[in-house]
Design a protein with these regions (language model features):
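Conserved N-terminal catalytic core of the sugar/cofactor nucleotidyltransferase
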Residues: 1-25, 29-124, 390, 398-399, ...
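Glycine-rich hexapeptide-repeat left-handed beta-helix
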Residues: 9, 323-429
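Short, hinge-like loop/turn segments at secondary-structure boundaries
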Residues: 70-73, 100, 128, 155-161
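Catalytic-core segments of class I nucleotidyltransferases/pyrophosphorylases
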Residues: 106-110, 117, 122-133, 145-150, ...
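Charged, glycine/proline-rich intrinsically disordered loops and linkers
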Residues: 200-216, 281, 367-381
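Long, charged amphipathic helices and adjacent flexible linkers at domain junctions
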Residues: 261-299
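C-terminal accessory/binding modules appended to enzymatic or scaffolding proteins
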Residues: 294-320, 324
């Protein structure tokens, strides 16, 4: 029997994802028409031996309740949300809920960070872990990055037999181009390691050496568990070449959307809208909107036959798209309205937002450099060294109104704004 743990953090995390995370928890933001962590759940349920999925975080239970209920109805696996009483780090939550994780005596458990998107090769990772025998405490999924980008991730050095001989989280200087993907298979014996760290923190606290102001149970998996395990012969790394990316900024959601839509061709072709088929239940059966693959259209969306969508577009529930609209490389969220002959490129249109006729909403993609092998998504800060806004995708927050014949370029609009003019390279507060 196996279990899986999905780590989702809490409300004070994911601030770079704002304004999209202001009204929707980041783990539940829809990418390719499904919440981010539903893609994790779907990867887990493909493993027959897996009987339970535990979602760990400190979002209020009320925000996760509906999602967990939906997943229970969709999949034949027990799914629960365990709420931490405070931020406990990437390993502290697992140690706090160790009894729930160990119940049923699972042989091992997966750990997936909730802020990554990937073509998760979980069966391959589990087989790799089993092949290393009982000595293996942790097996890490790794991928190649460029030399310059690797220092922004956890870096590991592999010795013979794929053993991790050295591990450093976000090193100051170059260590290795093989980075940690935030996807693990762990043996139950790992909890004894966590217990050792916890008890040493208790001793520090009792001797008044605890000066970080964090809870005693706050344990970082990467720094406090993985780094000491390196070189002990109990931690192994599996390099994979499949697609992987972090979801840190809103721009990475567009990038993730593109790749998940491409994966649907093999995993869920029914989720893709195909040219030549009826685009929505509200459209005339004999007329179809123009679709350039890959596109996901929710069944309740209304798309005019003269609209052109794609490539890499996701249309959410209740969306209304008018005549002559052109949308490319974008995510249109629930109940948004896009009126006649409007152009939307490299943008995310928030829930219940409205864009008038003949408007142009355009952003700048922040894709990996195609000329560099193994390049990952750049997650630049909002502002450059001159204090100017870095060009990025355009984001409309919840219930934003853009009037007709306006241009919105490389801008971020916070919720509930009614724009009265065009904007370029601005944050509209």
């Amino acid at each position: 029997m196996l279990k899986a743990i999905i780590l989702i953090g809490g409300p004070e995390k994911g601030t770079r994802f704002r304004p999209l995370s202001l009204d929707t928890p980041k783990p539940l933001f829809p990418i390719a028409g499904k919440p981010v962590i539903q893609h994790h759940v779907e990867a887990c349920v493909r493993i027959k031996e897996l009987k339970e999925i535990l979602i760990l975080g400190f979002y209020p239970s009320s925000q996760m309740q509906q999602f967990v209920s939906n997943m229970q109805n969709l999949y034949d696996v027990n799914i629960r949300y365990l709420q931490e009483f405070t931020s406990l780090g990437t390993a502290g939550g697992m140690y706090h809920f160790r009894d729930q994780i160990r119940s049923g005596n699972p042989s091992a458990f997966f750990v997936l960070n909730g802020d990554v998107c990937a073509d998760f090769p979980l069966p391959q990772l589990y087989d790799f872990h089993v092949s290393k025998g009982e000595k293996a405490l942790v097996s890490i999924m790794g991928t190649e990055a460029t030399r310059q980008q690797a220092v922004h991730y956890g870096c590991m050095v592999l010795g013979k037999n794929e053993e991790v001989t050295h591990y450093v989280e976000k090193p100051r200087s170059y260590v290795s181009t093989l980075i940690n993907c935030g996807v693990y298979v762990c043996s139950i014996e790992l909890f004894s390691r966590m217990g050792t760290v916890f008890h040493s923190k208790q001793l520090d606290y009792n001797s008044l050496n605890n000066g970080n102001g964090k809870d005693l149970g706050h344990i970082q998996l990467e720094q406090e568990i993985l780094t000491p395990l390196a070189g002990t012969g109990m931690m192994f790394g599996l390099p994979v070449s499949k697609w992987w990316s972090q979801i840190k900024t809103a721009g990475s959601a567009i990038y993730g959307n593109r790749h998940y839509l491409a994966l649907y061709k093999n995993t869920h072709p029914e989720r893709l809208a195909n040219a030549g088929l009826k685009a929505s239940e509200h459209s005339n059966g004999s007329l179809v909107c123009n679709i350039i693959p890959d596109v996901h259209i929710h069944p309740t969306a209304s798309v005019h036959p003269t609209a052109t969508l794609g490539p890499n577009v996701s249309i959410g529930p209740g969306v209304v798209i008018g005549p002559g609209v052109r949308i490319r490389e974008s995510i249109i969220l629930e109940n948004a309205v896009i009126k006649d002959h409007t152009l939307v490129l490299h943008s995310i249109v928030g829930r219940s937002s409205q864009i008038g006729m003949w408007a142009r909403v355009e952003g700048t993609p922040s894709d990996p450099d195609p000329n560099k092998p193994f390049a990952k998504m750049e997650n630049p800060p909002l502002f450059n060294n001159d204090g100017r806004l870095n060009p990025s995708i355009t984001i409309l927050g919840y219930s934003v109104s853009v009037p007709s014949e306006m241009i919105l370029l490389n801008s971020i609009v916070l919720p509930h704004k009614e724009l009265s003019r065009s904007f370029k390279n601005e944050i509209i507060l």
